Amino acid sequence: MSDQRHDLRQQALDYHAQPVPGKIAIALTKPAETARDLALAYSPGVAEPVREIAANPADAYRYTGKGNLVAVISNGTAILGLGNLGPLASKPVMEGKALLFKRFAGIDAIDIEVKHETSQQFIDTVAAIADTFGGINLEDIKAPECFEIEQALIARCDIPVFHDDQHGTAIVTAAGLLNALEVQGKQIGDSRIVCMGAGAAATACMELLIKCGAKPHNIFMLDRQGVIHSGRTDLNQYKQRFANDTPLRTLMEVIDGADVFVGVSGPDVLPAEAVALMAANPVIFACSNPDPEIKPAQAHAVRGDLIMGTGRSDYPNQINNVLCFPFIFRGALDARASRINDAMKIAAVEAIRGLAKEPVPAEVLTAAGVSELAFGKDYVIPKPMDARLLPRVARAVALAAVESGVARVALPADYMLG
């Protein structure tokens, strides 16, 4: 192990262990200093909101923290780049997600790690506790089970259920890609797209890109066996949706003349020779973490006309889910949405991409550690520390919830405009 990696490892362990173990805690929102305070907080006073909620369940939003509480739930079957290490090992990641909810959107989140033998057991467990929360964020659940789990929970719960590994990735990817194509003078409807990877993130990304205007026949998805095509008999129902009727079978064949490469697979799977075959002014989003499908220096050495994005903060155009999930939940919770639908996702895409075209405030430049940012090849998507994301994305999402009929409360006219 290199000294640098050892130092990072020790720093990370110390960060999680000190001064107290973990990254989140419970805070009180009411005084609890006197006998009267305690009588109101618990017995006998607590009986009054209990009666109100029993008579009208919607009053749980008035008398409890339900409306600002999200469950971050995992079974630990797809932990970051580490794989299936089980529920308990996923707890630091889920606590980290809860930290991000609080830091970026003021949302209280609690991590829940579920041990189960079947997907149905997981679904039943989450559905049974769903009334406690205003929303559910599913995390680090492997494909294809994640698709079944999310869809079943959306059907059974009357609160937003959102698998961030799918839809958060898709929203941020779509926002960045639409902007990158604009910079390159291209339209998504005319663009040939190669997607390396066919798991949860890849599938959601391509589905959302189609809803944003991409043509299905222009999408070429690859898994470990090569191109996903209509002649294959080994495809599950989720991959079958992207089976292209094509004679092409390899990456080198499908990338010849491609406008876009989206990588959600693994490190170093895109050779420089493939980049050289792409159409003029290509876009490469190599989003595998911590190491991308091709390093930016290698790609730029082959093509001076490309736009490059990765999942890393040390390169331009970071494709990071934190640009989306805190704010889409903020808008959904404030509108008391029953679900997060396509209209809300597309509203988030447009809000995120629109922000990248505006002048960048000095405080954002300082937080990003740069002296200048302007819409163009090295800046097609906002920086995660941009405080404008909260009002812009949350407002767009909440308004879309109202307009699409899934909101259950009216929004103030000046919501998130202050």
Short names for language-model regions:
Residues Y61-K66, K102-R103, A128-A130, I154-A155, ...:
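Solvent-exposed alpha-helices and their adjacent loops that cap or buttress functional pockets
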Residues L80, L85-A105, C157, H163, ...:
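Glycine-rich phosphate/diphosphate-binding loop of Rossmann-like nucleotide-binding domains
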Residues D111, N137-D140, V161-D164, M221, ...:
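General beta-strand structural signal in soluble alpha/beta enzymes
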Residues N75-T77, L85, V114-K115, D140-A143, ...:
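Short, ordered loop/turn segments at secondary-structure junctions
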Residues D164, Q184-K186, D190, S288-A410:
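Adenosine-phosphate binding glycine-rich loop
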Residues S2-V161, A394-R408, Y415:
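N-terminal ligand-binding/catalytic initiation module
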